[in-house]
C-alpha cells in the first residue's frame, strides 16, 4: 500500500516539474497543494502501518561536565554571562561612531532549538564591533602536554561577512580584559571566517623571534576541504584544534580532520628564515650578457629584397561592374529633414541636413568613383632582419650572490609558544544571531572527546531525530533548487515508469508463429482470438465424447481372453491417435 502512495507521489513530482518549467504561478500553487495532500496521505498510511512500532526516543538535554582536568570549560547553561567580561575599549584609527565595542552579547537558546534547555553565547548585533573574554582556570604553558581547543558555532541566519574565531590571549602583565581590542596580544587565533565567497578556517599563531624579540604571525595552509557548507547549512558545527609537542597539528570540523601539518613546514611565512640570502649590495656587471639569442652578424640582405614594396596593391585584373553609377554619390542629404526651430546658427553653426543612403544606389552595383580592389602584393617582403642565432657570449640570467643571513635563527620547537591566560572573541559581523557553545581547553584528548559527545553529540542526535523523511528532504531541496525536479524525473520517476511498463505489458505470440513449430496440418488462423478459443473448447468436448463411446463399445464387443493385453493396447493406440488430432495440441502456447 505504501509503495502505491510513493508511486503516486513520484507521478505528482513529475507533474510539478513540468508545470514549474512552464512558469505558471497559479498552477504551481495547485501543485504544491496536491503535493501536501499526497504527503499527508503517505504519512497517514505510514502511521497506520507502523502503529505497532514505538516512536523514536526523544533526546533530553543534560549539561556536559568535564571528565578530567581542563584549563577552561563553559556550556552557558547557567543562563548568564558570569565569568565573561565585556570590552569597554575603542579601536584605534577608526571613526568614533564605529570605534566602540558596543555589539551586544546574550546567553540564550537557539531560535530553532531541538534541545530545550541548551543555551549558548549569542552575538546579537550586526554591523558592530564585538569583544568579550574570560579568564582561564590557570594559564596554559606549552611544555609536554598537547593543546586542544574546541567549541561550537551555529550561523543561525547564515553569514554574509564576519568571523566566529577565538583568540587565546597571551599572558602579559598588561592584559586587561575590559580593554580587550584588536591589537591585544594573542598567542593563537583559530576558527571560521567568511566574507563574500571567501570561506576560511583560520589557524594563526604569533611566533617570537629569539634574536630580536619581535612577534610575527604564522598562518597555516588553507584546508583542502570545501568549507562552504559549514557556513550555509545553519547547523551547529564543532571546531577543534590540536597542537602536539612534536610540532604537528590537526584541525577538525565535526570530529573529522580537514587540515593537518607541521609547524616547521606548513606555515606561511616559515618559522625559521633561510640560512642564506641574496647580497643586497651585489650589482650586475655592465658587460654581463643575458641574451640567449642574437642577430647573426654575418648575415647580409639579399640584393633582390625590396623593403619599400607595399603589402597591398590594386587588382589589375578587376573590371568595373556594369551599371555602376559614377555620377551618383553613395550618401545624399535627407530631403525630408528640416532645420529645428531652436537652431541658432551663431551658436550651432550652419545647419546641414543629415546624410542618408542614396536610394538610386540600392538597385545598382555601386555609386561614386569606382576604384580597383586591393589585393596582397606577391612581391612584398617587408623590412629585412638578420636571422637569430645562439649567443656565444650568453652568461645566463644574473642573480646576486648568496651570503649568510645575518638574521638567521633556528627554532626547532615552535610548539613552545607564549603562554596564554584568557580566551576572547573579538569580532565584526554583518550578520546577527551567531551562536557559540561548549568552549573547552584541555591537554587531554579523552576529556575533550567526552565533552564533545555530551554536548555537540546531543545536538547531532536531536537533529537526526527531527530530520524529515527522504521524501520531505527531496521536496525541501527542490524548493531551494527548482532544477532538481528535472533530476527527480530522470533518475526516479522515469525509470520506475519504464520498469512498470515493461513488466505489465505482455505480448502474445500469434498462432501463425506458434504453428511454425510443427509440421502437423493446422486450420486457418482466425482473426479474432475469442472465436478461436471457443472453437477449440467445443472440438475438445466432442472428441472426449467420441472417445468415451468408443471405449464403451469396445468393452461390450470384446470379452476377457488370454490376449487381454493385446486388446487393451489397441484402444490405447486409437486414443493416442485421437489425442494427436485433438485441438488441444493446436492451442497456442502462452508465455
From Swiss-Prot:
* Residues recorded as bearing N6-acetyllysine in the entry: 138
**Compartment(s):** Endoplasmic reticulum membrane; Mitochondrion membrane; Melanosome membrane
Tell me the keywords, alphabetical order.
Answer: Acetylation, Calcium, Chaperone, Disulfide bond, Endoplasmic reticulum, Lectin, Lipoprotein, Membrane, Metal-binding, Mitochondrion, Palmitate, Phosphoprotein, Repeat, Signal, Transmembrane, Transmembrane helix, Ubl conjugation
Region annotated Disordered, chain positions: 261-347, 514-591
**Which residues take part in binding Ca(2+)?**
75, 118, 437
Q: Where is the signal peptide?
A: 1-20
Q: Where is this region: 4 X approximate repeats?
A: 279-346, 349-406
Acidic residues bias spans: 324-347, 555-568
Q: What is this protein called?
A: Calnexin
Source species, please?
A: Mus musculus (Mouse)
Primary gene name: Canx
